[in-house]
Amino acid sequence: MNKIVFVCLGNICRSPMAEFVMKELDQEKYLHIESRATSSWEHGNSVHQGTQKILRKYAISFDSSKGSQQISQADFEFFDLVVGMDESNVEDLLQISAGRYDDKIKLFRPGGVPDPWYTGDFEETYKLVTAGCRDWLQWIKDRQ
């Protein structure tokens, strides 16, 4: 269980933040970590400036050339865990996967992570994402 993909609506705020925070926390480089979108609305767009700013503030390395990418059926096959950032993302993932990968689809944290695209609160998003990534990393290690 070492391949994880974080998924949000557009793949420009929450899921790339989770991707880069988790990569930073995974000091042993044990995990293969990526992020995707449930929609194609932001396809190819770079990580949101608010996300980039907060990652810089906390000295989290990130790929500034990363572009938004919609999740595919091949992704459901490849990844061991498909983690939706909120309940709506999980519902979309369950629908997109048509019931074939329900066991891989998980909610990032109880209550989800509010979308800073709408809230404007990238600081709160970062705190929730960091705490959630720590929990996921421990959860994964406990199952190895």
Regions found by a protein language model. Give the residues of each.
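Conserved active-site segments centered on acidic
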Residues: 1-77, 134, 138-144
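Phosphate-binding/catalytic loops
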Residues: 81, 87-144
